[in-house]
Amino acid sequence: MVSQDFSREKRLLTPRHFKAVFDSPTGKVPGKNLLILARENGLDHPRLGLVIGKKSVKLAVQRNRLKRLMRDSFRLNQQLLAGLDIVIVARKGLGEIENPELHQHFGKLWKRLARSRPTPAVTANSAGVDSQDA
């Protein structure tokens, strides 16, 4: 079972990590006032990076609240997202949304991201072989 912490190893820390996700995302999930970009990372756990600029959310209090909610939602749903580097980009108007609505919205976005992942080729091939033999 994946631990539900948000330790240093589960964060995107360097500009190189962010650039890799921005340059070649394997998954994009647009949402209400935000965009989630994802890329396979080859690890057994997901990593999260947040981009919340002053232009999109003016007040520091609101930016900090959003970051806290995003991290918490990621922490609770990370078993769905194993092996992904994820960047959340905030857009204008995100700061005005209330906490319960944001939690619900993030839950839906994580599920959409998990569904949009490409299935591993090994699993697809082995399933095809089994069905042909039967």
From Swiss-Prot:
Keyword Lipid biosynthesis appears in the UniProt entry: no
GO cellular component: ribonuclease P complex
GO BP term, example: tRNA 5'-leader removal
Top-level class of the enzyme under EC nomenclature: hydrolase
Keyword tags: Endonuclease, Hydrolase, Nuclease, RNA-binding, tRNA processing
Molecular function per GO: 3'-tRNA processing endoribonuclease activity; ribonuclease P activity; tRNA binding
Catalytic activity: Endonucleolytic cleavage of RNA, removing 5'-extranucleotides from tRNA precursor
The EC number(s) this enzyme carries: 3.1.26.5
PANTHER family registered for this protein in UniProt: RIBONUCLEASE P PROTEIN COMPONENT
Annotated function: RNaseP catalyzes the removal of the 5'-leader sequence from pre-tRNA to produce the mature 5'-terminus. It can also cleave other RNA substrates such as 4.5S RNA. The protein component plays an auxiliary but essential role in vivo by binding to the 5'-leader sequence and broadening the substrate specificity of the ribozyme.
Record note on quaternary structure: Consists of a catalytic RNA component (M1 or rnpB) and a protein subunit.
Family (UniProt): Belongs to the RnpA family.
Protein name: Ribonuclease P protein component
